[in-house]
Swiss-Prot record:
UniProt xrefs under Gene3D superfamilies: Nucleic acid-binding proteins
Record text on subunit structure and interactions: Part of the 30S ribosomal subunit.
Protein name, entry field: Small ribosomal subunit protein uS17
Record lineage: Bacteria, Pseudomonadati, Spirochaetota, Spirochaetia, Spirochaetales
Listed GO biological process terms: translation
Keyword field: Ribonucleoprotein, Ribosomal protein, RNA-binding, rRNA-binding
Annotated function: One of the primary rRNA binding proteins, it binds specifically to the 5'-end of 16S ribosomal RNA.
Gene Ontology CC, one term: cytosolic small ribosomal subunit
NCBIfam families linked: PRK05610.1, uS17_bact
Organism: Borreliella burgdorferi (strain ATCC 35210 / DSM 4680 / CIP 102532 / B31) (Borrelia burgdorferi)
A Gene Ontology molecular function term of the record: rRNA binding
Record InterPro entries: NA-bd_OB-fold, Ribosomal_uS17, Ribosomal_uS17_bact/chlr, Ribosomal_uS17_CS
Family to which the UniProt record says this protein belongs: Belongs to the universal ribosomal protein uS17 family.
Pfam family for this entry, one: Ribosomal_S17
HAMAP family (UniProt xref): Ribosomal_uS17_B
């Protein structure tokens, strides 16, 4: 049974030194439950880049996939914005 609602995230590539793998930083704004102040929360995930089209600084869209390796559970969908 295929799951249709896969998670999609948009982030910035911070590393492309591994072969067919990129590290994407996801930045989100979350509100503190008590102080009601917005905080910037970031996390880094490894994503599979089969054709090695993305470079450091690019804005990319990634999608959740089956585990590819110990750390990779995301795959590159498209490069939204190239670094100039």
């Amino acid at each position: 049974m295929a799951r249709e609602n896969k998670k999609e995230l948009i982030g910035k590539v911070v590393s492309d030194k591994m072969s067919k793998t990129i590290v994407v930083e996801i930045v989100q704004r979350k509100m503190h439950p008590i102080y009601h102040k917005y905080l910037k929360v970031s996390k880094k995930v490894k994503a599979h880049d089969e054709k090695e089209v993305s470079k450091v600084g690019d804005k990319v869209k990634i999608i959740e996939v089956r585990p590819i390796s110990k750390d990779k559970r995301w795959s590159l969908v498209e490069v939204l914005e190239k670094l100039k």
